[in-house]
Amino acid sequence: MATIPDWKLQLLARRRQEEAAVRGREKAERERLSQMPAWKRGLLERRRAKLGLSPGEPSPAPGTTEAGPPDPDKSAVLLEAIGPVHQNRFIRQERQQQQQQQQQQQQQQRSEELLAERRPGLLEAREWRSSPGEMRDQSPKERESREERLSPREARERRLGIGGARESSPRPLESRDWRQSPGEAGDRSSRLSEVRKWRLSPGETPERSLRPAEPQEQSPRRKEVVESRLSPADSDHEKLGLTDAHKRRPDSGESQEQSLVLEASEWRLSSGEERKDCLEECGRKEERTLPGMVPEDITGSPETLTMEAAGSSSGGVEAADQRPIPVEDGERDLRLSEGWKWTLNSGKVRDRTPRDTETQSQKPESAEKHLGPLGAEAGEGEAEKEEAGAQGRPLSALQNRCSVPSPLPPEDAGTGGSRQQEEEAGELRPPPAAPLSPPPPAPPAPQPPGDPLMSRLFYGVKAGPGVGAPRRSGHTFTVNPRRSAPPAAAATPATPATADAAVPGAGKKRYPTAEEILVLGGYLRLSRSCLAKGSPERHHKQLKISFSETALETTYQYPSESSVLEELGPEPEAPSAPSPPAAQPDDEEDEEELLLLQRELQGGLRTKALIVDESCRR
């Protein structure tokens, strides 16, 4: 048997030593971890899982830390203060890495698509033409490499500084789009809104002239929300509209050659491979949307978002040419990037301007118009019908709510159409009261606006978000009239309390009826009623007037002061002034009931005999 060479023996010995050292370290680490509190152990393990092991190290057992020199890392972790999650530097690092990876992937995909779609000669010529003042010194490739060297923010600002003509050239637009993190997309859309005014050549057909109105109305962030809701086929068709529209340039002289490029790219995109690329990209976008969405955009209820998705898909599916809404692009971009801040079924007041209501009502109408033909054309009739069904209720509600002229027919809607619609929006602006009024399902507290008593009665009672009577804020329904009652309220002591409580004023309801007065546990609190002297603020503890079950069944009357004082007998002359002479005959009639009551009132009213006052004098 051949002897093992010397170098191999040395290698084996060194490996054994290393393994023994690693085992010893792991053992020490395990002991340390077992003595550590659970939260600290969890922190260490999470951090190790995030960082991952470098390839040269042997993988340690699951309960241990990294092999290699662990001491500096460990001390840093153990001394670290546990603050809010979004400030944790490990989590921030992880987020940055994820964003960088996503941006790289999307850049690669975008560049592949561009290479597949573009005709190099045309595109280079157009780019040279787009910025003649500045770009003479470099070829497109040099410019691209220089832009890649810049950080995304610098590149974006530099492009913004150059001006409108340059930035709507296709390649910078798309590369800027995909270099941004989703959070930056919104402010970009608002800043670009002024620069992106599409000038259309008079020679173009209305179909071509209407096409640019579509990409503006979906600011990038909203476009992502929409695409995450659409079925894959829908998003595929929408990509058609968007990628074409990204190629539009404001130069009216070049519209003819653009139409050629557009048709060519449409034809290519309809082929199978390109559609697969688009679908993959849509999938990636869906993954990226969910973490990247801004809370502002999700204020609407899910129903609202699906409605947006349905509306924009039906408008964007390859037939934006029929879409009659070329309103001012910049303003619409700003408005839509804020998100529609209204929900369909809640009773909150909508934050909408009249112009918003106009565009919204026009959008659903055009969406309804186009759902049928588009579904048939794209071969996805069922999906579109389902969307239309889900959309039906919100649409009808919207159209009833917004009293807006229906959009222009597609034939007239050229550039003149946009002017007319801007004028309509201007006319709509002065009376904001009609669209802003909330829908009927959430009525406020049921009182006429001019009735001060009822407004005082329902003070602090908020109308709930749904249909129904207002909720009461406390446990009891407190009657609180501060004005003097009308003269009809001065009644004889024999008048039952229910009649007192339901005295009608001159056409207005002054008191709640007997059904509205809530008696809880046998106690009724009427502040400032004819039964109680003194202000309710001072005596609110003493104003609980007690009933017994038998007395409630038989009568609603209270003993007069004179009878109670005769029974107690401390000062018989005091009640003569307040108690009227009319009280005497009634007392004689009702003696049996009063005897019943007096037995029960002896304990309760012995100390506070003067609280009950039947004269109703204010």
Curated annotation (Swiss-Prot):
The modification Phosphoserine is found at residues 54, 131, 139, 181, 201, 231, 437, 535. The keyword Acetylation applies. Residues 585-594 have a biased composition (Acidic residues). Residues 429-451, 572-583 have a biased composition (Pro residues). It is found in: Cytoplasm, Cytoskeleton. The modification N6-acetyllysine is found at residue 462. Residues 15-505, 556-594 are annotated as: Disordered. GO terms for molecular function: actin binding; phosphatase binding. The modification Phosphothreonine is found at residue 205. One of its GO terms (cellular component) is cytoskeleton. InterPro entries: Phostensin/Taperin_N_dom, Phostensin/Taperin_PP1-bd_dom, PPP1R18/Tprn. Residues 96-109, 308-319, 485-505 have a biased composition (Low complexity). Keywords: Acetylation, Actin-binding, Cytoplasm, Cytoskeleton, Phosphoprotein. It comes from the Eukaryota. Residues 15-33, 110-160, 173-197, 234-245, 271-289, 348-358 have a biased composition (Basic and acidic residues). Its main location: cytoplasm. Interacts with Protein phosphatase 1 (PP1). PANTHER family: PHOSTENSIN, TON-B BOX DOMAIN. May target protein phosphatase 1 to F-actin cytoskeleton. This is Phostensin. It comes from Sus scrofa. The gene is PPP1R18.
